[in-house]
Amino acid sequence: SSADSLPXHGAGXMP
């Protein structure tokens, strides 16, 4: 989802 690009959200790289 769009949240995946934010820190701490999956694809953001962070948990």
Curated annotation (Swiss-Prot):
The pyruvate dehydrogenase complex catalyzes the overall conversion of pyruvate to acetyl-CoA and CO(2). It contains multiple copies of three enzymatic components: pyruvate dehydrogenase (E1), dihydrolipoamide acetyltransferase (E2) and lipoamide dehydrogenase (E3). It comes from the Eukaryota. Its main location: mitochondrion. GO terms for cellular component: mitochondrial matrix. This is 55 kDa dihydrolipoyllysine-residue acetyltransferase component of pyruvate dehydrogenase complex. Binds 1 lipoyl cofactor covalently. Its cofactor is (R)-lipoate. Its EC number is 2.3.1.12. It is found in: Mitochondrion matrix. It catalyses: N(6)-[(R)-dihydrolipoyl]-L-lysyl-[protein] + acetyl-CoA = N(6)-[(R)-S(8)-acetyldihydrolipoyl]-L-lysyl-[protein] + CoA. Forms a 60-polypeptide structural core. Keywords: Acyltransferase, Lipoyl, Mitochondrion, Transferase. One of its GO terms (molecular function) is dihydrolipoyllysine-residue acetyltransferase activity. The keyword Transferase applies. Coiled coil: none annotated.
